């Protein structure tokens, strides 16, 4: 035995009833929503993300019909309000900078509202990699397509 172990059992004669119940209750759920085919997966603190963005950006002329732009899944991006900038004419663009990478979301009123509900934030992100060049400075960016937010104070 080990701590927090749990188990359940069901009488074999009740399996058909369980299947009918589960099928009825879960029929309206699309289990493929929020599913993404990603090409890369990294923890936010992984040191190779910057180089990966530079490497992928070298091939940006390849993406198009029949060759989709690669996506990356970033796990465990932990940050606070000091790492966030709200930008743009309409103040609806979010820029989160952490570990030398800028995570960008445009038209992000909902995200801005969600971020305001927490002091410490943990996010998982799916996005596309990009390089931003501004006055000779090149910054690796990830444009956020989808995200999950958790209260960073409760995450471990």
Regions found by a protein language model. Give the residues of each.
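Acidic, two-metal ion nucleic-acid-processing modules in DNA metabolism proteins
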Residues: 1-156
């Amino acid at each position: 035995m080990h701590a927090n172990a749990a188990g359940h059992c069901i009488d074999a004669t009740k399996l058909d009833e369980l299947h009918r119940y589960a099928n009825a209750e879960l029929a309206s759920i699309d289990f493929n929503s929020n599913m993404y085919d990603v090409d890369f997966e990294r923890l936010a603190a992984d040191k190779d993300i910057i180089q990966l963005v530079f490497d992928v950006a070298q091939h940006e002329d390849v993406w198009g019909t029949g060759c989709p732009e690669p996506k990356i899944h970033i796990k465990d991006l932990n940050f606070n309000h000091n790492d966030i900038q709200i930008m743009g004419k309409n103040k609806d663009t979010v820029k989160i900078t952490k570990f030398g990478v800028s995570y960008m979301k445009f038209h992000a009123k909902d995200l801005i509202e969600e971020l305001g509900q927490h002091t410490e934030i943990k996010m998982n992100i799916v996005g596309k990699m990009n390089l931003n060049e501004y006055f000779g400075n090149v910054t690796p960016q990830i444009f956020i397509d989808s995200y999950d937010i958790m209260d960073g104070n409760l995450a471990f």
